[in-house]
Amino acid sequence: MIFKNTELYNISEIEAAQNGSFNMLRVPKSVEKGLSSDAAERNKNCCGAEIRFNLKGDKAKLKLRMPEGSAASRATVLYGSIYSGWEEAVKTIYDRETEIVVSNPYDKEALKRLTEENRLPFDSSLIRIMLEHSNVQLIDIEGDTEPPRKEQTPERKYLAYGSSITHGSIGLNAPNTYPNR
């Protein structure tokens, strides 16, 4: 799904939440109507979802939140397949508006070289915000961005679905689980 010139990967659509933000749905709302109430609630779980984009300007600002009273969640920032710098690699998302600011990497050429030498699957200029678990809500995305191009992502896709460990929602370091590698 494309939202404000970014791709919401593994998200089929968004719906307005009562707090003014958006719930990101893994399957369309029309499908959710045939599910049990527990399964319908799991439809809002963002495990395995990513916000992907190319940064055309200097920076982008993502505004996310957890539902009120929810435990915090995390987002991991990658340049292609490579973790961003230590100051922005992992961000905590709270039950209030949380801003994640992403800038261009310090050394784009080094990232490009490492990606090519190691045959990494994602283009190093593609910014990926990996959402780990829970109902992360989207408020807004600001900045000069464009969606990924087809050649920036692996041709083959892998979908893991099953228990929370299988698809990564309860793993201690979700970006390093088998489905995410």
Regions found by a protein language model. Name each.
Residues 156-176:
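Catalytic nucleophile-elbow at a beta strand-turn-alpha helix junction centered on a G-D-S/GDSL motif
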Residues 1-157:
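N-terminal secretory targeting modules
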Residues 178-181:
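Short helix-loop-beta junction
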